[in-house]
Each structure stands twice: as C-alpha cells, then as structure tokens.
A protein has these predicted regions:
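N-terminal lobe/hinge region of extracytoplasmic solute-binding protein
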Residues: 68-125, 261-262
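N-terminal low-complexity, Pro/Thr/Ser-rich intrinsically disordered segments
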Residues: 40-65
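Gly/Pro-rich hinge or "lid" segments in bacterial periplasmic/extracellular proteins
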Residues: 102-103, 197-198, 216-218, 225-291, ...
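A structural "hinge/loop" feature
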Residues: 69-91, 115-116, 166, 221-234, ...
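Surface-exposed binding/hinge segments that line
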Residues: 166-242
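Extracytoplasmic/periplasmic ligand-capture domains
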Residues: 3-6, 18, 22, 128, ...
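Hydrophobic core
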Residues: 11, 15-19
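Bacterial lipoprotein signal-peptidase II cleavage site
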Residues: 23-33
Length: 384
C-alpha cells in the first residue's frame, strides 16, 4: 500500500481554483471518482483581494498556470488511458454528462450536470431505467452541437469487443451495472446467448436524450457518478472513424493533439512528448464562465527534487511534495491543505489465475485482519 500523501505549495491560488475541481478523481488518481478528502498543501501568504461585485469572465481567460507532473503521457484517448496524468488531460479537455464542480461558496465540490441537462430521470419504479437529457448548449470545441448520437457512438466504441478498449470493462460495471454491457464487451454468454450491441442497455430516445437500463436497481447519484468518469467523455465520430485500422481492431484517436476533438474546459495547445503539454481555454465549453485562466502548462519532471528547485526558482507556480519533503515546509506560511489523491481502499483481484488463493473469502478476511490499522492511522498528517 502506498502511504504517501501529497502536499502542495501553491502560489497562484486564484488561478488554480478555476481548475482544481476538474481533476480530483482518481483512476490512479482520479480524476473521474468523487474528489479526495482534504490533505495538506501551501499558498502565498496574501491572497488577491476579492471585488464585491462579480467580474465578467473573459471567453479566452487570463494568465498562465505552470506546474509539473512526474509521469509521461502515452494517450489522450478517453477509452484507453491508464495513468493519472492521462486522466487529468482528458478531464481538462473533455466534458462528461456529469462532473464535480465547486459549490456556490467554493467551500467544496458537488456532483452536478455538465453536458447533461439536469439529473437522470427515473423511468420505472425499481430504478433500472434512466433517461439523461443532453443540454442544447453543449458544444464541441469546433462549435458543433453535442447530441445523443455522439454519446451512442462513444459508448458503442468504448464497449466494442474488437477494439477491446481498456476502459470498457469499468464502463460496463462500476457505480452501475449496464444491462448486458459486460457480456457484450467480453463476448461471453448472458442468459444463454452472447449479446449484440442491440441487447446492451444503452438506447437513443431522441436527438438529445439517451436511456440507460441497468441489471440491478440503482439511484440517481450512482448513475451520475458513473457518467462523470473520464472514460465517458465523448469521442468525435468522424475523426475516430478516420483513424480506425482496416479490421477495426484499433484507432489512433488521441495519439496526438491533432487526433482528438475537445469538448471540455480547455483544448490542447502543444505537446512535446516527455517534456511538456499545454492547454488553452475553450470558449465553446458549456461552463466556460467558471474558467478564469487562459492557459495551462504541464511540465513532465520525473524527479520531485528538481520540481521543488524549479518552484523555488519561480519556474513553477505550485509544486506537490511527498511526505519527506513536507517536513522542511511544515511551518511554511505558504502551506495550504487542498483536495488531493489518497488511498481510499485496497481492492483484491479475486479473479487472478496466478493467485487463486485470493478467491478464498477466509484468506481475504485473514489478510485484512493482519493490517496494522493503528500504524496506518498515525500516518495521517496532523490537522492544521
């Protein structure tokens, strides 16, 4: 288990506030689960004075936020990403049906509609059929409307048994279990027959409405949470198809910034592999009035010590510290506690053929009874 907690030194709090809620999930992170609980982190001692009158937000934004990450980026395809940094890039540039946004007083975040036009509508008494309407204001970065067809195509490709997209299994079953989705994705029998796409519980009702049928009863929050993940961000059909190979087993969608169409808060500006990726504000984003910053610059710096040196030299606007580095900054007036990644729970892969003992429930109980809970609890940083 990783016991490392992340702490942040933040010099540009006002700029960061506009985007931090967009990447509080965790899929290695991310990014698209609910935001992590508060951990420690640092800020400039004086924050900008807030005007009593609301300020007009520019369609292009103002200012640049420069920060660093340790990982490299392999793909920008929401169906195939594997790392936290890839999830964050997709969440910066893609809009899902639902997402986590600041509440009115910015004291926390809440799960709200993004591209969706309101909460899911329960269509039967037992909570297995849900309709989601798409906002008429939802747009791709190229100005085209986002419709039900975009989500139908995206979800079909995500579950496509020939593409075998890495995120298809989680989309089939996570917060909710979509009817026949897993059996279609894995091409295994469901009630005696391998289902076709038409058997999967995802249907188009009209141009701006989709309907999802689940195999068990679900509630609205579960449906919204499931449809807030980064892998549910829509892909642009025309480009996705144009980049498909001849036997339809792979697409190069998302392998470069000119091979993806954005729908989120930012669009891709430039990408120098293993060095830097930058983003610029998307004026077509449905919630663009919430985004105050013009540009993000994410540098790839594997060594955290180097990141800290760059921060102190003024080359980065904030830096994340591991627990050992934090000891030197614990009393620094710039320290601020902010939402960050943390260990929620440890799942056990009960289906791993290389470790069949993990399928034994009594072994798993013994495993967790052996965990030293007191030592783990002591690792939590003291409250400030």
């Amino acid at each position: 288990m990783s016991t490392k907690r992340l702490f942040s030194l933040i010099l540009a709090v006002a700029m960061l506030a506009a985007i931090v809620a967009g990447c509080t999930n965790q899929n290695g992170a991310p990014i698209s689960s609910p935001p992590a609980e508060e951990t420690a982190a640092p800020v400039q001692s004086e924050q900008p004075t807030q005007s009593e009158e609301p300020q007009q937000v520019s369609a292009t934004g103002k200012g640049t936020l420069t920060f660093a990450r340790t990982e490299s980026i392999a793909t920008l395809n929401p169906h195939m990403y594997t790392s936290d940094i890839e999830s964050c890039c997709i969440e910066y540039t893609g809009a899902a049906l639902y997402g986590y946004f600041y509440n009115d007083d910015k004291s926390g975040v809440s799960l709200r509609a993004c591209i969706a036009d309101g909460e899911p509508i329960k269509m039967n008494d037992n909570g297995t059929v849900w309709q989601i309407k798409i906002s008429p204001d939802a747009r791709w970065a190229n100005g085209e409307a986002i419709t039900a067809d975009d989500f139908m195509y995206s979800f079909k490709m995500l579950l496509d048994p020939k593409l075998v997209n890495g995120r298809g299994g989680a989309f089939a079953e996570d917060y909710i279990k979509i009817l026949n989705a897993k059996a279609y994705y894995t091409q295994t029998e469901a009630e005696g027959a391998v289902p076709t796409w038409e058997d999967v519980g995802i249907k188009k009702v009209d141009d701006m409405t989709i309907e999802i049928t689940t195999s068990i009863a679900q509630d609205a929050t579960e449906v919204m949470s499931h449809l807030a993940y980064a892998w549910t961000v829509p892909v642009y059909e025309e480009m996705y198809e144009s980049l498909m190979n001849s036997d339809r087993t792979a697409t190069t969608y998302g392998t470069d910034i000119d091979k993806v169409v954005c729908s989120g808060a930012f669009t891709y500006n430039a990408w120098e592999r293993d060095a830097e990726i930058s983003f610029k504000k998307n004026p077509e984003y449905i919630k663009q009035d919430m985004i105050q910053i013009e540009k993000l610059v994410m540098k790839i710096i594997p060594d955290r010590g180097t990141q800290l040196q760059m921060f102190e030299a003024g080359e980065l606007d904030y830096v994340e510290l591991n627990s050992s580095q934090f000891k030197d900054y614990e009393e620094d007036p710039r320290v601020l506690y902010s939402p960050s990644i943390y260990v929620k729970y440890m799942p056990v892969n009960v289906n791993n053929p290389d470790n069949p003992i993990l399928s034994d429930v009594n072994f798993r109980k013994a495993l967790f009874l052996a965990v030293d809970r007191e030592s783990i609890a002591k690792l939590h940083p003291r409250p400030r």
